[in-house]
């Protein structure tokens, strides 16, 4: 297993996103859910998978003691470890790496952790801690106080696909956030020409590159639903140069043969939506190709005026092979979602 310092975070992200096309498969914004846990006396296990960065308020106390934005168990655990089981928000995934963040847990942080996983075909989520199907995918490693631990599996993506994750904390303590990155296994199509959102993260889409994401992550473009406020969209900083544009390149969940329509949604962006947008597509010839959307771009949606807080629907109805799309916003601003409906 390889660990990365914060100075090497760019390399870590390159391995996760560019090389392995992985996303955080347990996060709550994708529908990840805490199924069960051994203990959460001081702070809720559900905090682990929240998309926001952890915060600290040293003046705040609750019935159990000092308030912490994370998962914290009680002292003096008589068992070997505490644990939490999380159901992925995607159908299944192959795991490559992750992050354990002990932010603000200092003197009460988790000394060691390990990660196990299993695959379950049922939908009821009735998974128990001592299920015989659990396999270790990240070996036990040491955690320090109030710091981020970035790691990648030494032997690459797991060969097996998984649906559930078990985080083990030895022997007890606190963890602020838990991210686990994997390549999504899309659900099987009912028929070959079954129309789906090819730019939906749960169908395997990944945001590969972007010009800027100052106020909101480009990954948010691919999330389910229309969100709840501006925080869960993609937003760039204000531009001051004439002719400026911002852009995002997205690898579709599968290569298209037909595109029915494209939707660009500016939900909740009312005074900061882009003035215009364009959408282009290109075809990456093979998985081994170094091309990540830098080929010949073909116009799918020409320069179009946008408005605040609405879905902009562009009828395409064209047979076209596309593996990547490029959303360009002119000159800058915020977009909530992009949908590429086709097969």
UniProtKB/Swiss-Prot annotation:
Biological process annotations from GO: allantoin catabolic process; purine nucleobase metabolic process
Keyword Protein biosynthesis in annotation: no
A Pfam family reported for this protein in Swiss-Prot or TrEMBL: Allantoicase
InterPro entries: Allantoicase, Allantoicase_dom, Galactose-bd-like_sf
Pathway in which the depicted protein is active: Nitrogen metabolism; (S)-allantoin degradation; (S)-ureidoglycolate from allantoate (aminidohydrolase route): step 1/1
Single Gene Ontology MF annotation: allantoicase activity
Domain of life, source organism: Eukaryota
Similarity comment text for this entry: Belongs to the allantoicase family.
Function: Utilization of purines as secondary nitrogen sources, when primary sources are limiting.
Protein name (Swiss-Prot/TrEMBL): Allantoicase
Species per Swiss-Prot/TrEMBL record: Saccharomyces cerevisiae (strain ATCC 204508 / S288c)
Gene encoding the protein: DAL2
């Amino acid at each position: 297993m390889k660990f990365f310092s914060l100075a090497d975070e760019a390399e870590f992200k390159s391995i996760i996103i560019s090389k392995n096309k992985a996303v955080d498969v347990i996060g709550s914004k994708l529908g990840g859910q805490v199924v069960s846990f051994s203990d959460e006396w001081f702070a809720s296990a559900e905090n682990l998978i929240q998309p926001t960065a952890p915060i600290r308020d040293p003046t705040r106390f609750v019935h159990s003691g000092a308030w912490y934005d994370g998962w914290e168990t009680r002292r003096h655990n008589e068992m070997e470890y505490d644990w939490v089981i999380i159901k992925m928000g995607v159908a299944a995934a192959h795991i490559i790496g992750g992050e354990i963040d002990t932010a603000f847990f200092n003197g009460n942080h988790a000394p060691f952790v390990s990660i196990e996983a299993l695959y379950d075909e049922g939908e009821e989520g009735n998974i128990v801690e001592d299920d015989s199907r659990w396999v270790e995918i990240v070996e036990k490693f040491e955690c320090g106080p109030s710091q981020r631990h970035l790691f990648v599996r030494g032997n690459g993506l797991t060969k097996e696909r998984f649906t559930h994750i078990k985080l083990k904390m030895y022997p007890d303590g606190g963890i602020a956030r838990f991210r686990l990155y994997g390549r999504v296994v899309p659900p099987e199509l009912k028929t070959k020409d079954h129309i789906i959102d090819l730019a939906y993260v749960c169908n395997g889409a990944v945001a590969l590159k972007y010009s800027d994401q100052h106020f909101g992550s480009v990954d948010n473009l691919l999330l389910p639903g229309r969100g709840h406020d501006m925080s869960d969209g993609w937003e760039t900083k204000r531009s001051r140069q004439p002719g400026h544009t911002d852009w995002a390149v997205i690898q579709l969940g599968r290569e298209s043969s037909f595109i029915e329509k494209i939707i660009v949604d500016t939900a909740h962006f009312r005074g900061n939506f882009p003035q215009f947008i364009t959408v282009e597509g290109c075809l990456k010839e093979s998985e081994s190709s170094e091309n990540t959307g830098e080929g010949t771009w073909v116009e799918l949606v020409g320069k179009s005026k946008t408005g605040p807080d609405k879905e902009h629907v562009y009828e395409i109805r064209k047979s076209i092979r596309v593996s990547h799309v490029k959303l360009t916003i002119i000159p800058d601003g915020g977009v909530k979602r992009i949908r590429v409906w086709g097969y």
